Amino acid sequence: RDAGIVNQLRELIEECGAKRTLVDIELTESCFIEDEKSAIDLMRQFKQLGARILLDDFGTGYSSLSQLTRLPIDVIKLDRSFITGIDQNYQSQSLVRSLLGLARAFGFAIVAEGVETEREMQFLKDIGVDYAQGYFYSKPMAPDMFEAWVADKKKLRLIA
């Protein structure tokens, strides 16, 4: 809705010297309800800056599969309601497998939100989900704690 937001992002990227490809813009389905045309135009401008567009909480709101053919998105984030207990829920497994196939057909990556157990993580890994996030990996933390956590993870990768 703020026409200057693209310029603000451009300025921030230049100020910080950030790699444009590291910028992700997460939008929920509700962003497209009032004015889909303007939202699509805004997403294209973000993409021209190198940002990836992520559709957050997919499948929980006003989603229409036809939107996937119109929206310039890169990633679909599956809501945790599909993920919780997926290792034991065959209906959720079928749904997520279907969404994964659909995402592949459109060239989208998939993020599974709300992964809390090793069994959920393993199932998602086995079916080829691209990314996962949730308490299984880490609880929310302050920026300084995050930096220490990342540094520790890098050390573990070097050892392994």
Which residues make up each language-model segment?
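C-terminal helical cap(s) of enzyme catalytic domains, especially alpha/beta-barrels
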Residues: 125, 141-160
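The catalytic core of metal-dependent phosphodiesterases that act on cyclic dinucleotides
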Residues: 1-86, 102, 106-140
